[in-house]
Amino acid sequence: MIGNLNRKLRNRLSDGDWLPICTTVGGQNAIAISFDDGPSPCTTPTILHLLARFDATAAFFLCGERAERYPSLVEDIAAQGHAIYSHGYWHQRMDEMSPDAFARDLARTEAVLARFRPTPSPYILRLPYGSGHDSARVHAQLRSWRDDVQIAHWSHSFEDWTLADNCDSHATLQIRCDDAIVTALADRGFGGSILLLHEDAIGSASALSGAIAPLLLAALLRGIARYGIKTTTISASTDCSTLSRFVRFKAVR
């Protein structure tokens, strides 16, 4: 019992290193859609078409390596006015990187993304795999790189990288995506959520991986239109008090 209490305290206290973490957006009639791992020619063009068709907005957390490989897709995202943020260069777990490698990865990613949009401040990013969002050491390394870093986490994940597992057809995948949206919309906590989706998820072995995001997004946009839910941007957290740097009052999953 004492050991569990000590672990919980360690996850809540720091030496002033905790950064703000964004997990929700204001109001029950809005959600924020976010995509990790892009850009990808398998997904980005269709995603942008769907967002434009439904007059919706999204935040794209891009991997530097993919952004460098597909610059025209990043240009298209920026041209449509969607937010572009960092998701690391190689999509490596940041809680397993050395401080030097950590800083190089972040700097290299921003050097790529800065070609397409101004460097944001506060500097919102998403950690690959969500790795280290609960680690004071990772927060300290982020703060030493840029003092204005804020972590964009999420409050609803579709775990979409699993939807094509053992899936034998596009039609079956469509059913799974539709069911995932029905379940999400029935959740009382859905309104105000930051939603986590993936573009052609890194590490997925399924041949249908590239079809997941377009199918899921289409079902999502149809669903929120029926419920009168709008899309909004991920805004910087306003909880930047001195005390919040030392104590986290709310656990983040």
Where are these regions (language model features)?
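Catalytic domains of cell-wall/extracellular-matrix polysaccharide-remodeling enzymes
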Residues: 68, 91-230, 236-239
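Hydrophobic beta-strand scaffold residues
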Residues: 58, 84, 150-151, 231
